[in-house]
């Protein structure tokens, strides 16, 4: 069944199935993320899901809504999943709990629940954490080939809950790669290094050892791309938003890179690093907070792509997907107003 707009307000069964399909489509990306960055992401997702179900159940109870029926729509689980995989794998446990509470209680239920929220709940929770705890939110481990210390499941669990592995290493020590240099994400490394080095020298660093983009990150993005194509094939999402998002981001990156290759990242680095594919197929396509008309979706997706590029290049944050999505959410009523198909026989009011 093809859904044109906000299906969550009128068909409980289709909502549950679509949410479950989106969750399953995340699996290829989660597998890649777990392989390159450890088991922490799985632990974060589990903590987020438990918190989301408890928080949503409590609020529904207070609102005297049918708790079990509403929880079974899987929307809380999907919000928790998207937030959990967006956080650094070894972020402290209280961060994912706080972010999930904010996403479910404030960004979703405060507006009336599923189908009423004007902003993407997972991205609201993410941005709150990023602004409040910037150091912890940028503490990503090096990808597996560059890790100086391998972090197993037990050490991941210990670090998330205590801040230390069984051998006493903290997150800052774990961030040091095999070469003794503290590692960052490809986008963060490129943005920071541009202050003192040209692009061709920056790209010689080990973190950029991937064929398409950053080492490890390219496979995470490919995983979410595979899942996104599955959603398109099953018609769970429309093609307009991801295609216009990726074309706008890739186009801006290509033009700037061709003009000044020593000062701008390549289109491939933008498309296959950070949260690009996750944002294009799983976050921006949220039918509640996105535009609902075909032309509107194209404008909405392109706006997000342009904003992501602007934030990555000129902003204070290395990625920018979350901020771009929330800023675009603000424009949805205006976009929908001017892109609604004209009713047959409609005449303008002027004489």
Curated annotation (Swiss-Prot):
Record-listed FMN phosphoryl threonine modification sites: 185
Quaternary state and interactors: The complex is composed of six subunits: RnfA, RnfB, RnfC, RnfD, RnfE and RnfG.
Protein's UniProt keywords contain Oxidoreductase: no
Domain of life: Bacteria
Bilayer topology: Multi-pass membrane protein
InterPro entries hit by this protein: NqrB/RnfD, RnfD_bac
PANTHER family, sorted: ELECTRON TRANSPORT COMPLEX PROTEIN RNFD, ION-TRANSLOCATING OXIDOREDUCTASE COMPLEX SUBUNIT D
Species annotation: Yersinia pseudotuberculosis serotype I (strain IP32953)
Function: Part of a membrane-bound complex that couples electron transfer with translocation of ions across the membrane.
Alphabetical keyword list: Cell inner membrane, Cell membrane, Electron transport, Flavoprotein, FMN, Membrane, Phosphoprotein, Translocase, Transmembrane, Transmembrane helix, Transport
Family that this chain belongs to: Belongs to the NqrB/RnfD family.
Protein name: Ion-translocating oxidoreductase complex subunit D
One cellular component term from this protein's GO annotations in UniProt: plasma membrane
Pfam families: NQR2_RnfD_RnfE
Enzyme Commission numbers on file: 7.-.-.-
GO biological process: electron transport chain; transmembrane transport
Compartment(s): Cell inner membrane
NCBIfam families reported for this sequence: PRK00816.1, rnfD
First-listed, main subcellular location of the protein, grouped into a coarse class: membrane
Gene that this polypeptide is encoded by: rnfD
Essential cofactor(s): FMN
Transmembrane region(s): 18-38, 40-60, 87-107, 121-141, 211-231, 241-261, 264-284, 298-318, 320-340
């Amino acid at each position: 069944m093809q859904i044109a707009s906000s299906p969550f307000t009128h068909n409980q069964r289709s909502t549950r199935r679509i949410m479950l399909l989106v969750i399953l489509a995340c699996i290829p990306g989660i597998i890649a993320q777990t392989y390159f960055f450890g088991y922490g992401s799985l632990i974060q997702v589990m903590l987020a899901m438990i918190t989301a179900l408890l928080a949503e159940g409590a609020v529904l109870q207070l609102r005297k809504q049918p708790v079990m029926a509403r929880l079974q729509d899987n929307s809380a689980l999907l919000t928790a999943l998207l937030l959990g995989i967006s956080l650094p794998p070894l972020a402290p446990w209280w961060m994912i709990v706080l972010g999930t509470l904010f996403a479910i209680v404030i960004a979703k239920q405060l507006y009336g629940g599923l189908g009423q929220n004007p902003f993407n709940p997972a991205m609201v929770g993410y941005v709150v954490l990023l602004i409040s705890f910037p150091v912890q939110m940028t503490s990503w481990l090096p990808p597996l080939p560059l890790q100086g210390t391998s972090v197993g499941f037990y050490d991941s669990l210990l670090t998330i809950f205590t801040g230390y592995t069984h051998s006493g290493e903290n997150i800052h020590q774990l961030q040091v790669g095999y070469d003794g240099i503290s590692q960052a994400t490809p986008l963060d490394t490129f943005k920071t290094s541009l202050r003192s080095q040209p692009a061709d020298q920056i790209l010689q660093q080990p973190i950029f050892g991937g064929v398409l983009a950053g080492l490890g990150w390219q496979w995470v993005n490919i995983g979410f791309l595979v899942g996104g194509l599955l959603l398109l094939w099953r018609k769970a999402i429309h093609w307009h938003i991801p295609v216009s998002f990726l074309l706008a981001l890739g186009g801006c990156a290509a033009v700037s890179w061709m003009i000044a290759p020593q000062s701008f990242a390549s289109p491939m680095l933008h498309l296959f690093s950070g949260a690009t594919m996750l944002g294009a197929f799983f976050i921006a396509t949220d039918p509640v907070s996105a535009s609902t008309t075909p032309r509107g979706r194209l404008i909405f997706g392109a706006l997000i792509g342009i904003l992501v590029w602007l934030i990555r290049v000129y902003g204070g944050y290395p990625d920018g997907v979350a901020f771009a999505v929330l800023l675009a959410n603000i424009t949805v009523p205006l976009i929908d107003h001017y892109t609604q198909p004209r009713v047959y026989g409609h005449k303008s009011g002027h004489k």
